[in-house]
């Protein structure tokens, strides 16, 4: 009798995706982040569901309801902090996952890569709206500043902002709709993640060498299931260390002050995972220019397959490109630091230089380095 997992219509899908899937024999731990992102997403949906049971999306009670969750609900504090810090772990995994894709040339799987970029945008939108929900000072002013950026769009900008706000400022209507969107988006992300996997399984995984691994495949289970379990344990360990020892490490103290439209905090800044993009936005003195640079800083990922000039797919055997890749990582860390600093000398000029460097590296230096490497190998 044939095994049920190979015949049952539903089990067959699971089997072909997670059990009998032919996987390259040499994929490293950098390939763990896909499954870790799946775990993060499930964790966020579960903790978010339990938070939504006690949260009220009204300006008068939102802040109090979060306090109530932390003080009065059974283990409410741990659910709240797992959700808040879970978002940080989610973005750490996301950045590692995208970085892996850039380093090893995974962007050559066009459909998978483009769905991935859409997933990144959707996750950023979800995280932004989630940050507004506790209705603290940084929630309110963050929402005001970021939504206001849309007013830079010529002709329709102002109308668009007021339409999103549901009034003439960030208020009840804004909070309610942000809660609705924050609830629905993770399920859209889950559906997109399935499409992401569907496209990936059309081609099979890439591997560190960037060379076809069709000649040397191993079954996903037990080899990579056990590897993913180890990754998951380390992820949960890191998350719980954060939650149980320093739950507010990555948060902003201003968010423990209830939202007050009459009092602007001295330094308005988003969560740490948006700081690099925020620094790029602030480094351009023009409003529309800043917004365009902000969007392009992420949208530039879509251009990666077009900017690939090397005859090799991966950077594994390309030392000049490797060097530039790590300079790009250092540049992004610099931008993250600058995004959290006040707008004054010397931070302004450092931010502007780091922003120029970011686009210069991706658009000019890395493709040039690839061409030089081709010539060095007489290709």
From Swiss-Prot:
Binds 2 heme b groups non-covalently. A ubiquinone binds at residue 201. Heme b b566 binds at residues 97, 196. PROSITE patterns: CYTB_CTER, CYTB_NTER. GO terms for cellular component: mitochondrial inner membrane; respiratory chain complex III. The chain crosses the membrane at residues 33-53, 77-98, 113-133, 178-198, 226-246, 288-308, 320-340, 347-367. Gene3D superfamilies: Cytochrome Bc1 Complex, Chain C. Signal peptide: none annotated. Coiled coil: none annotated. It comes from the Eukaryota. The cytochrome bc1 complex contains 11 subunits: 3 respiratory subunits (MT-CYB, CYC1 and UQCRFS1), 2 core proteins (UQCRC1 and UQCRC2) and 6 low-molecular weight proteins (UQCRH/QCR6, UQCRB/QCR7, UQCRQ/QCR8, UQCR10/QCR9, UQCR11/QCR10 and a cleavage product of UQCRFS1). This cytochrome bc1 complex then forms a dimer. This is Cytochrome b. It comes from Redunca fulvorufula. The gene is MT-CYB.
